[in-house]
Amino acid sequence: MNHSYVIVIPSTIYNVPAPLTIVDGLRVAVKSALAKAFGGYTETMATGGYKAESGELIEERVYLVEAAYEVEDDELVESLALQVKQELHQESVMVYYKDLRARFI
């Protein structure tokens, strides 16, 4: 496997904690889709932050869901990111396209 996708799932809507049912539902949807398409995923909880229009630094819990792949499917990954963006009313959702060297032993 030479590449991986990472979709960053935020946990807020307009600086307010999002309902867990929405966040957890999106996490399950993304993980299920990546597992089906690429055989598996890794999820990591982290802290993300951004500067609000007011100038305030906003920090929130985020979930990074990563899947390694040999055959790309940008359309799937971008549609998942769009779903996250829409359901959590985000201006944008970050997707990493990473080169890596990995194998199963």
Regions found by a protein language model. Name each.
Residues 1-105:
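Positively charged, small/polar-rich N-terminal and surface patches that mediate targeting and assembly
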